[in-house]
From Swiss-Prot:
Reaction(s) catalysed (UniProt annotation): (S)-2,3,4,5-tetrahydrodipicolinate + NAD(+) + H2O = (2S,4S)-4-hydroxy-2,3,4,5-tetrahydrodipicolinate + NADH + H(+); (S)-2,3,4,5-tetrahydrodipicolinate + NADP(+) + H2O = (2S,4S)-4-hydroxy-2,3,4,5-tetrahydrodipicolinate + NADPH + H(+)
Listed EC numbers: 1.17.1.8
Residues given in the record as NAD(+) binding sites: 12-17, 38, 102-104, 126-129
Quaternary structure, from the entry: Homotetramer.
One protein family per Pfam: DapB_N
Entries under PROSITE patterns matching the protein: DAPB
Cellular compartment(s): Cytoplasm
Record's protein name: 4-hydroxy-tetrahydrodipicolinate reductase
Length: 273
């Protein structure tokens, strides 16, 4: 067994992403699976987390109480729902635990709670933990600065039928990257739906389109369209393991941080490019 540099706890251990995170934690050099959590009353409580994830016996039992495992982890990884994540955030803030947050769908109050907690603990909060997606966000900033003022900009995203929020957190991050590069606020220029007689496209807006179907892991395209040409920048994920590995990489990166709010671009050093 490799020597652990960081011990992690995984929220939502029985979910699609939770199982991928457990597999990644058990396989990644420098990481130790310290705890796995499920909601109270879950039929999965008492299971071996590794066996649950199809990764072999881990010796870590799935539990519902953070209090019971507070001494077993350094960083808490959460890809669940906003209400649950905020409960976990309060606990980690109280006990000085770092967090990696991949949950999407937070309202403004939830985002503010994360910002406030980051004054005391270190948090990596990102809409997407894929290396490729975060490289794409950097490319979008550069494309927007060159083409954004004279292009019609549309963002199209597709996910599996079980995803509960729309647009996806990644699509919103794409919009924010583009809007920021154009010195705009996404709230002021986003168009999230079109139906019926809409009139002509309003110049300077950023449109969003959402697809929910089948088992699509995640596809995102940003379109910069002008008369006679268009540029499309696309990312397609074929496995959730890319997100899981990015989250574990973030947990390792957090080991030297006392407090602060970071995203994957900080982890990858993309802001220096």
């Amino acid at each position: 067994m490799h020597e652990a540099q960081i011990r992690v706890a995984i929220a939502g251990a029985g979910g699609r992403m939770g199982r991928q995170l457990i597999q990644a934690a058990m396989a990644m050099e420098g990481v130790q699976l310290g705890a796995a959590l499920e909601r109270e009353g879950s039929s999965l409580l008492g299971s071996d987390a590794g066996e649950l994830a199809g990764a072999g016996k881990s010796g870590v039992i799935v539990q519902s109480s953070l209090e019971a495992v507070k001494d077993d982890f350094d960083v808490f990884i959460d890809f669940t729902r906003p209400e649950g994540t905020l409960t976990h955030l309060a606990f980690c803030r109280q006990h000085g635990k770092g967090m990696v947050i991949g949950t999407t769908g937070f309202d403004d109050a939830g985002k503010q709670a994360i910002r406030e907690a980051s004054q005391e603990i270190a948090i990596v909060f990102a809409a997407n933990f894929s290396v490729g997606v975060n490289v794409m966000l950097k490319l979008l900033e550069k494309a927007a600065k060159v083409m954004g003022d004279y292009s019609d900009i549309e963002i199209i995203e597709a996910h599996h039928r079980h995803k509960v929020d729309a647009p996806s957190g990644t699509a919103l991050a794409m919009g924010e990257a583009i809007a920021g590069a154009l010195d705009k606020n996404l709230k002021d220029c986003a168009v999230y739906s079109r139906e019926g007689y809409t009139g002509e496209r309003v110049p300077g807006t950023i449109g969003f389109a959402t697809v929910r179907a089948g088992d699509i892991v995640g596809e995102h395209t940003a379109m910069f369209a002008d008369i006679g040409e268009r540029v499309e920048i696309t990312h397609k994920a074929s496995s959730r393991m890319t997100f899981a590995n990015g989250a574990l990489r973030s947990a390792l990166w957090l080991k030297t941080k006392k407090n602060g709010l970071f995203d994957m671009r900080d982890v990858l050093g993309l802001d220096v490019l």
